[in-house]
């Protein structure tokens, strides 16, 4: 029986690169793949998945109201499909995650989903939350923080480089808006008060980083 796979990570771990390589491996063997990408992500143009190392492929865009089971079923009426790959899977809805599981169970087509686990506040995305619960296989794609530790979190930053703590969960951007960090540096950036927020700059109370 086909399985639902979820490859998760923070940003800059090569998720899209792995997706494109997986699709290439299928196609090299004469098999057909379908790449899905959320229409909200237009960093590289509509209907396209691209990696930071310069490779790209066309994709079929979807939005949160689309029925992905029906979308895939319609594609199989044109050509047989051997694998479905989903980029930026954190933007899936709970219902769409279930529909992808139906692609595996009803159509017997494996689904490989790639996405972020948590947002800039350390909270799970809707799609990631339900993929973590429903996927048959979970795989973490790893990258590193500037300190050398494994990076598991992401910070949203302003144009001036200041950490943004509040705002909408979804805001499309790349390295100019987000920084990949370990849990320690995430907590320091999010929870430690900036100097200009301290009530008394000459207070003898030690800062968190000095404790």
From Swiss-Prot:
Short name of any one Pfam family annotated for the protein: TK
EC number(s) per entry: 2.7.1.21
TM annotation in the entry: none
Enzyme active site: 88
Catalytic activity: thymidine + ATP = dTMP + ADP + H(+)
Keywords noted in UniProt: ATP-binding, Cytoplasm, DNA synthesis, Kinase, Metal-binding, Nucleotide-binding, Transferase, Zinc
GO CC annotations, alphabetized: cytosol
InterPro entries given in the database record: P-loop_NTPase (IPR027417), Thymidine_kinase (IPR001267), Thymidine_kinase_CS (IPR020633)
Assembly with partners or alone: Homotetramer.
Protein name: Thymidine kinase
Annotated organism of origin: Rhodopirellula baltica (strain DSM 10527 / NCIMB 13988 / SH1)
């Amino acid at each position: 029986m086909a399985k639902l796979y979820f490859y998760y990570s923070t940003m800059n771990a090569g998720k899209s690169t792995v997706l494109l390589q997986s699709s290439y491996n299928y196609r090299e063997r004469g098999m057909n793949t379908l790449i899905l990408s959320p229409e909200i992500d237009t960093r590289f143009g509509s209907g396209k998945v691209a990696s930071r190392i310069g490779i790209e492929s066309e994709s079929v865009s979807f939005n949160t109201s689309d029925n992905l089971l029906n979308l895939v079923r319609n594609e199989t009426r044109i050509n047989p499909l051997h694998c479905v790959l989903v980029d930026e899977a954190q933007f899936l809805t709970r219902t769409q995650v279930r529909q992808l599981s139906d692609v595996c169970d009803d159509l017997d087509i494996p689904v490989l989903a790639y996405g972020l686990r948590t947002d800039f506040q350390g909270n799970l995305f809707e799609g990631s939350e339900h993929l973590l619960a429903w996927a048959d296989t979970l795989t973490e794609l790893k990258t590193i923080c500037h300190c050398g530790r494994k990076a598991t979190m992401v910070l949203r930053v302003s144009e001036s480089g200041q950490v943004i703590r509040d705002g909408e969960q979804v805001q499309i951007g790349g390295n100019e808006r987000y920084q990949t960090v370990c849990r320690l540096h995430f907590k320091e950036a999010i929870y430690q008060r900036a100097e200009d927020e301290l009530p008394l700059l000459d207070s003898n109370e030690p800062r968190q980083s000095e404790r």
